[in-house]
Amino acid sequence: DFGAWFDSRYGQQFTGRKGSDIRTDLYVTVEEAFFGARKDIYVGMGKIEFEVAPGLSNGSTHRVTGRGQKGSTPELNGDLIVKISYLRHHQFEVRGVDFHTTMKISLPTAAIGGSEYVQVLEEKIKIKIKPGTQPDTTLRVQGKGMMTRVGLRGDLYIKIRVEIPTSLSSIERDFFEKMQAGLT
């Protein structure tokens, strides 16, 4: 064995060459990060199946030991460093463990209250709109955000957008004129 020969010849242990680490980005959907998934990563000539555990956070890095560049022995192979990056979601933005979205409501709903529904991944959530809700009001729904590694959930934040009608029927116009006259 070369290492033993080298040790006997020069009086020190031959340690060999460690392979370099390989860094890669793994792009996952919010759903994959929330529920968990298996993703294939192609490195060099090989494929590695990577377990996306539920609650992996955006920007987090994970080390897969021995799956980087080859070393002089298998024990000296480098590691694969995987950085998790969320793909943009069509419905909401993920900030930390919280979901942020907007909801359009009608002017009458803003004035007298009501309820609307918002879809968040696995469920449809009923949102109560209080009478007198102002444009750009932000509502918070606890425990309806992103899953964390320990099984807890962040919050859902909903920014209210009040839709102002661009065309009115004669009845609607009459109603708003009477309402305006009553306010002055």
Predicted segments, located by residue:
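Post-J-domain flank of DnaJ/Hsp40 co-chaperones
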Residues: 1-42, 72-75, 183-184
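Intrinsically disordered, low-complexity linker/assembly segments
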Residues: 47, 51-184
